[in-house]
Amino acid sequence: MSINEQQLLKEEYYAEAVRYMNNAKENLAKAKKEGKFYHDKKYVRTACGIAYSGLLVALDGFLRLKDIKPKPKDRKSIEFYQSNITKIDKKMLDYLNSAYHILHLSGYYDGIENATVIKEGFDNAYKIIDKIKP
């Protein structure tokens, strides 16, 4: 892949990941934060799910830049991302694991309402997204 192709790929995946994150922030704002907690689980869950999806978009772009693709007909899982990221960037793996637990498990599935925890999940997602910033 040429440098120009890599740049175009970064721009495409970065823009899409940021679009997801902006949408997630809009949904989170609807959850009505009071003090250190959000008060509408529906919007918290939605926002966390969208933010996690944005993180996955960024990871897909990052792995494509490294010429890593899933096998045809295989569904990508957290294990796919973890096993490939661990070979490339251990710090990114820490951000991925943290964001996975906060955004996907605690936020999306459990509807955690603690604003500090959710912010940490969003921050970790942005650290991954910034890895493909053009």
Predicted ranges, named:
Residues 1-134:
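Terminal alpha-helical segments
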